[in-house]
From Swiss-Prot:
Required for proper assembly of pre-ribosomal particles during the biogenesis of the 60S ribosomal subunit. Residues 273-282 have a biased composition (Polar residues). One of its GO terms (biological process) is rRNA methylation. The active site is at 159 (proton acceptor). Residues 401-411, 840-850 have a biased composition (Basic residues). Residues 273-305, 388-414, 529-569, 620-646, 811-850 are annotated as: Disordered. It is found in: Nucleus, Nucleolus. Component of the nucleolar and nucleoplasmic pre-60S ribosomal particle. One of its GO terms (cellular component) is nucleolus. It comes from Yarrowia lipolytica (strain CLIB 122 / E 150). This is AdoMet-dependent rRNA methyltransferase SPB1. The keyword Methyltransferase applies. Residues 537-561, 628-638 have a biased composition (Acidic residues). PANTHER family: PRE-RRNA 2'-O-RIBOSE RNA METHYLTRANSFERASE FTSJ3, RIBOSOMAL RNA METHYLTRANSFERASE.
C-alpha cells in the first residue's frame, strides 16, 4: 500500500507543531505565551495567581504551571470542557455570563490575580466583518473580568484581530494600564490576522466609568462631521490629502457658487472652504427648496413666479440682477477682489479676510441684517425681592472676583519667593524699609495730596510726609539715628557669640579637632572679668528701666577691663602650647638686651615668661643642674608676635630624647624649603630674622571681632616661595611614611615569624632524635629529615571542612540522595528545621533564666 499523505492546510504541521508534540503541549499556541513572557520581563515567574480565559485545550495553563512559583493558583475556564491538568483548576463557563464571575470569585476568595490571559476567538467562517466584531466584543468582556480581578500592577495579555475596532480597544486599554504594547510572536503564523496586546502595570482605579466596558459605547461609529473648512480658510498654507474620498455625485470636482448665495448664506466659511469659484450669475431655487414656513420666516425676501429671489429695499423691490449691479458698484469691489473670486483654492489668509469684509459690506447694502421694524422689547420691572436677589448676586460676584485677585496675588508672591530661594537671593529686602520706617519711599499720590508736586518739579529737594504738615529738608533727612553705641556693642557681642558657636559646631564634626582637644586639654571658655557693680537684692528678680540704664553705663566703664581680661586669656591659651617650652627662655634672655622685643609680645605673655623661668629653675634644682637666665641668648629660633593659623612646622608630642626639647617634624612645603635652604647655606639666621619683620607683623587687631581676625589670618599672610627640591623631598618622605605598615600588620608578621621559629625548633629536636637513633640507616634518617623539612615549608591548611547547605524546597523538595551539582559534605535544611532550632534556643534561654 502506498503511504497516505496528510494535508498540511495553512502550514499547520510546521516546526512549532512538532515541538509541541515533543514537549507534550496540547497546542502549538504554548510557544506564543512563552515568547511573550520572555519578551516582557518574565511576568509569569512573578505571578502567584493566574487566570486563563478561553483556556481550551489548556496549553497556556500548562505553561503557567511550569513557569509560575510553587503553590501558585492557576484557574482556567472555557465554554467547552477542558481535560484536567496538574496544579490547575478548570471549569466550564461562558466568560460573558455572571456564572463565570461567580465561579472565579468562589475559587479566588479574597485574592487578586497577578496575570490575566485571554486567547479566545469566536467561531469564524460566516463573514469577516462580523467575526472581527465578535472577537472585539470577546476581548472587551475579558478586559471587564481582568479589571475586576487584577491586582494593582498586574498584567493582562489578550489576542486581538486587526480590524477597524482595534484603535478603540487600544484606547480603552490605555485608560487602565500604564504601558500597552502590541506584539506578534514568531510562533504566530504570518497569514493569521491575530496580534497580541500586552498590558503592563494595572492602575487599579477606584472609580471606573461603565461606558469604558460597554461594547455599544466603545465600538460606536461616530459620524464624521463636515470638513474642517475653518482650517482651509484661516490656514490655507497647510495642504491636506483627501484620504476619505469624494462626495457622491461630484464627478467634476469643481464647485461654483453664486455671489448672492455667498452673501445671503449664514455659513460663509464653509462656502469658502468647499467652493472653487464664485460667479456673478443670479441664483436659482432648486425644486423642493421653497416651502410655506420659509416664506413666513423671510419677510424681507420675495420670489417671483420663476423662483428668483426679490429684495425689498426702502419699499422698493429689486431682482437678482439689480442686486448684483449694486454689489458690483461697491467701493470694496476692486479688480483684485474680482480676480480672487475666480479661483478660491489659491488664496491665502489675507485674501480670505478681505472677501469676508467685502461680504459684510454687501449685506449692509442689501439690508439683510437690518432688524425688523416695529418690534419693541419690553423690559419688565423687578419687584423688591428680585432687586435684593440681584444685588446680592452682584455682591457675591464682586467678592468672588476680589478673592480671585487676592489668591492670584498670593500665588505670584509665592512664585517670586520660590524663584528668589532658587537663585540664593536670601537677603531680606525689608531691612532698608524698616530702618527708614517707610518714610524714604516717594509716593506720587501723596505728593499730589500735599500740593507740593510743583516744588518737586522745580527741583527742590524736600521730603513729602503722609500728612503733608511736616516739611523735612535734605540736611534733616540725612541725619538718621542708627542706634546708640550700646546697641552696636550688643550687636557685636551677638555676632561674636554666633561665630563662636559656629566654630564649635565645625570643630565637633572633625575627628582631628577632637584629638587635638584631648591632647591640649585646655579650657576654651573665655573669662570677661568681674564687674564692679554689686549684684545685690535684685540679682534674682527683674531689673527696672533705671537699673538697665545703670548696667549699660557700668558695662561701658568696664569695657577696657573686659578687653584686657580677654586678651590675657587669649595669650595664655596661645602660649600654653608645648611649642613655646624652649622658646620662652630665649625671649626672657633677650628682654634685658632688647627691651623693645618684649613689647612686641601680646599682653599676658610677660607673666607667662616669668612662670616659665620659675619652672626652669625648679627643674634645674631638682636634677642638680645650674640654670642661667642668659643660657639661651644665642638661640637661632626667633619668636613671631603674630599668631598664625597655618604653621609651617608641626610639633609632634610624644617620646623625645630630652624633656626640654620638642619633637619637631617638617610636614609642609614651606618648612621643607626653609630647612633645605639652611642646610645648603642659601640662607642664615640673620636673614630669617629679617624675614620675620614684614607688613603682617605689626597689625593691630585689638578690639576686632574674632571672625574678622580669623579671616585676616587666613588670607593676609606672607606667602613664602617653595622650591622644587623641597617638594620632591617632602613627597619622598611621605611616600616612605606611607610605605611603612601599620602596627597591627607588624604584630601579625611578628607572630607569624615566631610560629615559624617554634616549628623550626621542634624540627631541630626531632632531627636530633632521628640522628641519635642507631637502628635507622643513614638513608632512612635523611628521608625522615626531608619529610620534616617539606612539612615545615608546606603552608598550614585549615582543618575545618566546608559543609554545603541545601534548601529542601523547590527542585530539591522530596529528593532522595545527594542533590544534583553538590560535592563534598552537605546538609539538607528546610523551614521546619529552622523553627525547631529556634524553639530549642528559646527553651534553653528559659531554662537559663530559671
Amino acid at each position: 500500500m502506498g503511504k497516505i499523505q496528510k494535508k498540511h492546510g495553512k502550514g499547520r504541521l510546521d516546526h512549532y507543531y512538532r515541538l509541541a508534540k515533543e514537549k507534550g503541549y496540547r497546542a502549538r499556541s504554548s510557544f506564543k505565551i512563552i515568547q511573550i513572557n520572555q519578551k516582557y520581563g518574565k511576568f509569569l515567574e512573578k505571578s502567584k495567581v493566574v487566570i486563563d480565559l478561553c483556556a481550551a485545550p489548556g496549553s497556556w495553563c500548562q505553561v503557567a504551571s511550569q513557569l509560575c512559583p510553587v503553590n501558585s493558583l492557576i484557574i482556567g475556564c472555557d465554554i467547552v470542557p477542558i481535560k484536567p491538568l496538574p496544579n490547575v483548576i478548570t471549569f466550564q463557563s461562558d466568560i460573558t455570563t455572571d456564572h463565570c464571575r461567580q465561579q472565579l470569585r468562589q475559587y479566588m476568595k479574597t485574592w487578586k490575580a497577578d496575570t490575566v490571559m485571554h486567547d479566545g476567538a469566536p467561531n469564524v467562517g460566516m463573514a469577516w466583518a462580523q467575526d472581527a466584531f465578535t472577537q472585539s466584543e470577546l476581548v472587551l468582556q475579558s478586559l471587564k473580568l481582568a479589571v475586576e480581578f487584577l491586582n494593582k500592577g498586574g498584567t493582562f495579555v489578550t489576542k486581538v484581530f486587526r480590524s477597524k475596532d482595534y484603535n478603540n480597544l487600544m484606547w480603552v486599554f490605555q485608560q487602565f494600564f500604564e504601558k500597552v504594547e502590541a506584539t506578534k510572536p514568531p510562533s504566530s503564523r504570518n497569514v493569521s490576522a491575530e496580534i497580541f496586546v500586552v498590558c503592563l502595570k494595572f492602575k487599579a482605579p477606584k472609580k471606573i466609568d461603565p461606558r469604558l466596558l460597554d461594547a455599544k459605547y466603545v465600538f460606536e461609529e461616530v459620524s464624521q462631521g463636515n470638513n474642517n473648512n475653518e482650517a482651509k480658510v484661516f490656514n490655507p498654507e497647510v495642504k491636506r490629502r483627501k484620504r476619505e474620498g469624494y462626495e457622491e455625485g461630484e464627478y467634476l470636482q469643481h464647485k461654483r457658487l453664486s455671489i448672492l448665495d455667498f452673501i445671503t448664506d449664514s455659513t460663509p466659511i464653509d462656502n469658502l472652504g468647499e467652493t472653487n469659484e464664485m460667479t456673478w450669475t443670479p441664483r436659482s431655487i432648486k425644486e423642493g427648496e421653497v416651502d410655506e414656513e420659509e416664506e413666513k420666516e423671510k419677510d424681507k425676501e420675495a420670489r417671483d413666479e420663476r423662483g428668483n429671489v426679490q429684495y425689498v429695499l426702502d419699499d422698493k423691490v429689486y431682482s437678482d440682477e439689480d442686486a448684483l449691479k449694486m454689489v458690483s458698484k461697491l467701493p470694496q469691489t476692486t479688480p483684485e477682489l474680482l480676480e480672487c473670486l475666480k479661483d478660491l483654492k489659491v488664496l491665502g489668509r489675507k485674501e480670505f479676510r478681505a472677501i469676508l469684509k467685502w461680504r459684510l459690506s454687501a449685506r449692509d447694502l442689501l439690508q439683510i441684517d437690518k432688524p425688523e421694524a416695529g418690534v419693541e422689547v419690553e423690559e419688565e420691572e423687578l419687584d423688591e425681592d428680585q432687586l435684593i436677589d440681584k444685588e446680592l448676586s452682584e455682591l457675591g460676584e464682586r467678592e468672588k472676583a476680589r478673592k480671585k485677585r487676592e489668591r492670584r496675588r498670593r500665588n505670584e508672591m509665592k512664585q517670586r519667593e520660590i524663584q528668589r530661594m532658587q537663585m540664593n537671593m536670601t537677603t531680606p529686602t525689608e531691612l532698608g524699609i524698616e530702618a527708614a520706617k517707610m518714610e524714604s519711599l516717594f509716593n506720587l499720590k501723596q505728593a499730589e495730596r500735599t500740593g507740593k508736586l510743583s516744588e518737586l518739579q522745580k527741583g527742590k529737594r524736600s521730603h513729602v510726609s503722609e500728612t503733608g504738615d511736616e516739611h523735612v529738608t535734605l540736611e534733616e533727612a540725612e541725619r538718621v539715628d542708627y542706634g546708640s553705641d550700646d546697641e552696636a556693642n550688643g550687636l557685636e557681642d551677638e555676632l561674636e557669640s554666633m561665630y563662636t558657636e559656629y566654630l564649635e559646631n565645625k570643630a565637633a564634626r572633625t575627628a582631628k579637632s577632637v584629638v587635638q582637644r584631648k591632647k591640649a586639654n585646655v579650657e576654651t571658655e573665655e573669662w570677661f572679668g568681674i564687674s564692679d557693680k554689686k549684684d545685690g537684692d535684685e540679682s534674682d528678680g527683674e531689673m527696672s528701666a533705671d537699673d538697665v540704664d545703670m548696667a549699660t553705663i557700668d558695662d561701658g566703664e568696664d569695657e577696657d577691663d573686659g578687653k584686657t581680661a580677654r586678651t590675657l586669656n587669649n595669650g595664655n591659651m596661645f602660649f600654653s602650647n608645648p611649642i613655646f617650652d624652649n622658646l620662652v627662655n630665649a625671649a626672657v634672655a633677650k628682654t634685658e638686651a632688647k627691651p623693645k622685643a618684649l613689647d612686641l609680645l601680646e599682653p599676658g605673655a610677660k607673666d607667662l615668661i616669668e612662670l616659665e623661668k620659675a619652672k626652669k629653675r625648679k627643674y634645674a634644682k631638682k636634677n642638680g643642674l645650674e640654670y642661667s637666665d642668659s643660657e639661651d641668648e644665642e638661640d637661632d629660633i626667633v619668636m613671631e608676635t603674630q599668631k598664625q593659623d597655618d604653621s609651617d612646622i608641626e610639633y609632634v608630642h610624644g617620646e623625645s630624647d630630652s624633656d626640654d626639647e620638642p619633637n619637631i617634624d617638617l610636614v609642609t612645603d614651606q618648612a621643607m624649603t626653609m630647612a633645605h635652604q639652611l642646610a645648603t647655606g642659601q640662607t642664615n639666621k640673620h636673614k630669617l630674622q629679617d624675614d620675620g619683620y614684614n607688613r603682617y607683623s605689626f597689625r593691630d587687631l585689638d578690639g576686632l571681632p574674632q571672625w574678622f581676625q580669623d579671616d585676616e589670618n587666613k588670607h593676609n599672610k606672607l606667602n613664602k616661595p617653595i622650591t622644587k627640591e623641597a617638594v620632591e623631598a617632602l613627597k619622598q618622605k611621605m611616600k616612605t611614611l606611607n610605605a611603612r605598615p601599620i602596627k597591627k600588620v607588624l604584630e601579625a608578621k611578628g607572630r607569624k615569624k615566631m610560629r615559624a621559629l617554634r616549628r623550626l625548633e621542634q624540627m631541630k629536636k626531632k632531627s636530633e632524635l632521628i640522628n641519635e637513633d642507631g637502628a635507622r640507616s643513614e638513608k632512612e634518617k635523611a628521608d625522615d629529615i626531608s619529610k620534616l623539612m617539606r612539612k615545615l615549608a608546606k603552608p598550614q591548611k585549615s582543618k575545618k571542612k566546608t559543609v554545603t547547605v541545601v534548601y529542601a524546597g523547590g527542585k530539591n523538595k522530596g529528593i532522595a540522595g545527594r542533590p544534583r551539582g553538590v560535592t563534598g559534605k552537605y546538609k539538607m535544611v528546610d523551614g521546619t528545621m529552622k523553627k525547631e532550632q529556634r524553639a530549642i534556643r528559646r527553651i534553653k534561654k528559659k531554662m537559663g533564666k530559671k
